Amino acid sequence: MNNFDIEKTLSTMVCLIDTRERDTKEAEKRYQALGIPYRRQKLFAGDYSAVFTLPTGEEFSMEYLCCIERRYDLTEACMCCTSERNRFIREFERAKEKGIKMYLLIENGSFEKAYNGQYRSKMHPNALIANLTAWMARYNAHIIFCKADTFPKLCREILYREAKEILTNMEVDT
């Protein structure tokens, strides 16, 4: 693809939001803050991905290439290591089997807060850190901490940049 076609394709970005992501007033604000159109559909893995329209008119979906899993805070991340562990691991395994690049964005947290136990869970900080770093090693997951109001911008930017890299290296008949 030439640069013009890549830019044209990227301008058609629609964020895909998993139907299992809770649909609340706060979530609606987050979706609006993405600054691009969005649609809800069941995703294979993760909470967010993207779809684009190629110059040929065909849809180019990132669903099986890149996804973002969102957690509200470290307390919710702890649940991924305890009560929701099996479901969470299955999701990472599914993504790994398909070669999907997985990002885990944790709002309102940091590694410093994790090390200092600044979350509401009985989980020991060492156990939380061990889980987070094991996921990075085992599943090639990218764990990023951000503020809640940064999430929509960062989500959009990650999906945009991932798509741009893929499109730049992709051979498509236009």
Write out the residue ranges for each language-model feature.
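Non-catalytic C-terminal interaction segments of nucleic acid-processing enzymes
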Residues: 1-63, 75-174
